[in-house]
């Protein structure tokens, strides 16, 4: 196990099986920055995390048995098993020991004061915000679910995203943790919202010094932990209350109080009600951890967001927003943010459902969420490698349930999107929705050859 107290063995390579995964790529970057030799393997298909890996000079290899050797520490992505990956199969058959991502991380974080961010939605944005503020105040290492990682050997703090899928967060015992919400997702694993709650309740019991949870979530109100639980939100019965909220096209301004103690006014250059909550969670955590509020206030103002969370670009005077939203709750939050920043523009949603199981389980909720847009376009369902399409649901089934104008498009023909004027285009999904986005960008660029 790698710790900062040990002499670095610079000849030992750390090999990541599935290095393009968002958590894996972030961890690879972190260890690379700490001075370790890092490499990894994955499929050839482009994934947005590989830009950072390539920029750092980290080798990305095709999957091959020859990648596995005696002189390395192996970290395997959670999705890779003996029956679907030749490297995992080779390692198991030949006695090579490896750790799963979450197992490695659970041991690694023990050398720091660790701050986790869990929740069904908003983990990545909140982790990014917490890491941004803390790294500008003191030496901080972090892992963010957008594939971003930073490693400093002398860090006091370690900020990380804590994922509930398949209960992967159970090896984690952080000093502090934010939990943004509890909601039913991952129907391929969880049996229902009560099963999700049970997982989060088990995780909460492992937090050591302080738990910060959204007070208006009825499931979060039922959590139990030996650590103090602090509720944040908009209601007077919360421990940390955000109030006097002013939403504008420049972001959100608000005040926070803790009991009778006024913590002051804050600004975050982010949009949507959910981002006020995320910022309040960060403020609460850092206040209890003893961080000076003037410093928190100063660095909240300079947060520029995380990858694939309301990421904006301008192509020929057309605004395109890229977002990872793949659950109805996330879609509503993203469209709310778009309306805050662009109140006078038509909001056009382009959404790709992610996994057949989720689409079946939440079909009506997806339709209701997408009705928050002015117009809707749907891409074909992106199936997970963990499931088989039995033909039980088609994207047209979702289109039929949407009240607003809704059409199905293909990646080869996105020209129907040109029918809108004075519009903002919001591309949402966790699959390959960016292929549709790139097709639209190319179409716009070819119209005037004036890309900026």
Curated annotation (Swiss-Prot):
<dbReference type="GO" id="GO:0071555">
    <property type="term" value="P:cell wall organization"/>
</dbReference>
<comment type="function">
    <text>Cell wall formation.</text>
</comment>
<dbReference type="GO" id="GO:0005524">
    <property type="term" value="F:ATP binding"/>
</dbReference>
<keyword id="KW-0573">Peptidoglycan synthesis</keyword>
<dbReference type="InterPro" id="IPR000713">
    <property type="entry name" value="Mur_ligase_N"/>
</dbReference>
<keyword id="KW-0436">Ligase</keyword>
<dbReference type="GO" id="GO:0005737">
    <property type="term" value="C:cytoplasm"/>
</dbReference>
<keyword id="KW-0963">Cytoplasm</keyword>
<dbReference type="InterPro" id="IPR036565">
    <property type="entry name" value="Mur-like_cat_sf"/>
</dbReference>
<keyword id="KW-0131">Cell cycle</keyword>
<keyword id="KW-0547">Nucleotide-binding</keyword>
<dbReference type="InterPro" id="IPR013221">
    <property type="entry name" value="Mur_ligase_cen"/>
</dbReference>
<dbReference type="InterPro" id="IPR005758">
    <property type="entry name" value="UDP-N-AcMur_Ala_ligase_MurC"/>
</dbReference>
<dbReference type="Pfam" id="PF01225">
    <property type="entry name" value="Mur_ligase"/>
</dbReference>
<dbReference type="Pfam" id="PF02875">
    <property type="entry name" value="Mur_ligase_C"/>
</dbReference>
<keyword id="KW-0132">Cell division</keyword>
<dbReference type="GO" id="GO:0008763">
    <property type="term" value="F:UDP-N-acetylmuramate-L-alanine ligase activity"/>
</dbReference>
<keyword id="KW-0067">ATP-binding</keyword>
<dbReference type="GO" id="GO:0009252">
    <property type="term" value="P:peptidoglycan biosynthetic process"/>
</dbReference>
<keyword id="KW-0133">Cell shape</keyword>
<dbReference type="GO" id="GO:0008360">
    <property type="term" value="P:regulation of cell shape"/>
</dbReference>
<protein>
    <recommendedName>
        <fullName>UDP-N-acetylmuramate--L-alanine ligase</fullName>
        <ecNumber>6.3.2.8</ecNumber>
    </recommendedName>
</protein>
<dbReference type="InterPro" id="IPR004101">
    <property type="entry name" value="Mur_ligase_C"/>
</dbReference>
<feature type="binding site">
    <location>
        <begin position="119"/>
        <end position="125"/>
    </location>
    <ligand>
        <name>ATP</name>
    </ligand>
</feature>
<comment type="pathway">
    <text>Cell wall biogenesis; peptidoglycan biosynthesis.</text>
</comment>
<dbReference type="Pfam" id="PF08245">
    <property type="entry name" value="Mur_ligase_M"/>
</dbReference>
<comment type="similarity">
    <text>Belongs to the MurCDEF family.</text>
</comment>
<dbReference type="InterPro" id="IPR050061">
    <property type="entry name" value="MurCDEF_pg_biosynth"/>
</dbReference>
<dbReference type="InterPro" id="IPR036615">
    <property type="entry name" value="Mur_ligase_C_dom_sf"/>
</dbReference>
<keyword id="KW-0961">Cell wall biogenesis/degradation</keyword>
<dbReference type="GO" id="GO:0051301">
    <property type="term" value="P:cell division"/>
</dbReference>
